[in-house]
Amino acid sequence: VVYTWKDEKSGGTRISDPEKAKQIAEKAKRYPLVLQNVEKKKKQKEAPLLYDLTELQRDASARFGYSAKQTLNLMQSLYETHKVLTYPRTDSRYLTKDIVPTLKERLDAVSIGPYKALAQQAKRSPLNGKLSFVNDAKVSDHHAIIPTEQYVQLSALSNEERRIYDLVVRRFLAVLLPPCVYEETVIRASIEKECFTARGKRMVEKGWQEAYEDNRYDEEDEAKEEVREQNLPLLEAGMKIGQPKISLREGKTKPPAHFTEGTLLSAMENPVRYMENRDSSLVKTIGEAGGLGTVATRADIIEKLFRSFLLEKKGNEIYLTSKARQLLKLVPADLKKPELTASWEMQLNDIAKGKKRRDVFMEEIRSYSVELNDEIKTEEGTF
């Protein structure tokens, strides 16, 4: 069993003082580890929500290295040509109530090959109490991406199309399967007043996770550094473990990772963390507006930046070109901030509510554009 040291005051698992770390390691060599508390809880986890376009683009980028534009094109083909998936340019991850009666037909349509057993299981599973993915209020123009009632011929799809189709079908099946049920064990131990923790998990019922061959959607806890998930033997409070092996792991603070297309899409959808001004009205407005761009335009925006040689890819990571760095030096600071989009959206909302006149807003934009132009002309840099 791997136990991780934990600061009782802060809850952190890192020690910045090397001497203190060595002192704790010395204690572990001289004193036993005593189990203070062993707590077991049965938990359940619902399936992830259905796909909207952005979430699908993120997954396709992470799994297959597909660009946002490539995923959109593949989705468009599956929608228009093969007619096996629903409308792709949606920003909703929910279904409307009128779709519920069609779910059985859609399950019949995907009840082939690798999906047959799962589809049959989903049909046997009662829908009562698990329609959390049905919410009319969270669907504006188009519902989440799901299979149509059209029977699919997998042999008619290209390899790339099959990959996208597979993502959508498995997600669709997952929301119709029972929750995943597991038993979580949390152990709190000590070595001479130093706190150590361990956490383990035992699967009780796989539920919706049967729709996935890997445990991609069971990573929430594993992503936390303060504990490690592991299979645990039978342990009880009061047990002593004599002279446990101890290891010190030295680490360094890493700079922020470069964007991939998937993480860039996430940042465009929710740019709040990149805002210097966290004014609540600005944050609320940009959230309601759906971030920078729309679900239908983000792929084209990213593609245009590549075509204009402002961005370049090295592997899956995105880098600025020298041309982009030149441009960013010339552009006034306000024009590079998400706050500007939020401010304009607020004013457009005021126009829609009759609180502001359209011609006044347009005149302000014209004046602002002239000021920007003059400011850029006086800059010393060139582009």
Predicted region positions:
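Basic, low-complexity terminal or inter-domain segments flanking catalytic cores
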Residues: 21, 39, 68-69, 73, ...
